[in-house]
A protein has these predicted regions:
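Conserved alpha-helical scaffold segments that buttress catalytic/binding sites
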Residues: 1-30, 34-149
């Protein structure tokens, strides 16, 4: 195909209506959140630059429907952002759509994990990082304490 990845996917913007997800297999979600990204300022920024480069790529030789659902903006509190992400992920997972999250910090992994609660599914998470981000139950959730031993 001569079309780029960006030309092949459904893209939601303020100008476009929310895309029909009936045949969508993968959904990209941006998260404009970085308040709990300790020592990693800007994790919720620059998503348009990431998209610009992603959209330039050429898709492989497999038919897969992808939608870019836009960005979840930073809530009044970080818990508001977690709630919005959790609700959207639960909806996508229930519809058998694989979510890909861009932006935000490692603390969003916990919200991603909790999206499976409503579905009563067991989930395993693999975290690839340069260190273990272990904290205790009592610790505030941050990018450096989102896992517990």
């Amino acid at each position: 195909t001569n079309q780029t990845f960006g030309q092949c996917m459904k893209i939601y913007t303020e100008k476009n209506n929310f895309p029909d997800l009936s045949n969508t297999k993968i959904a990209i979600i941006g998260v404009l959140e970085g308040r709990a990204s300790v020592g990693n300022y800007g994790t919720g920024l620059g998503l348009d630059e990431v998209r610009k480069e992603l959209y330039k790529l050429y898709p492989g030789n497999w038919p897969i429907n992808v939608a870019d659902l836009g960005d979840i903006i930073e809530g009044n509190t970080i818990e508001d952002t977690y709630f919005a992400l959790n609700e959207l992920l639960s909806f996508l997972i229930k519809g058998k759509i694989i979510p890909i999250i861009i932006g935000g910090g490692q603390d969003l992994t916990y919200s991603n994990y909790r999206a499976y609660d409503k579905l009563e599914q067991t989930v395993n998470i693999v975290a690839v990082d340069n260190k273990f981000d272990l904290g205790s139950i009592e610790d505030e959730l941050t990018s450096q304490s989102y896992l517990t031993p």
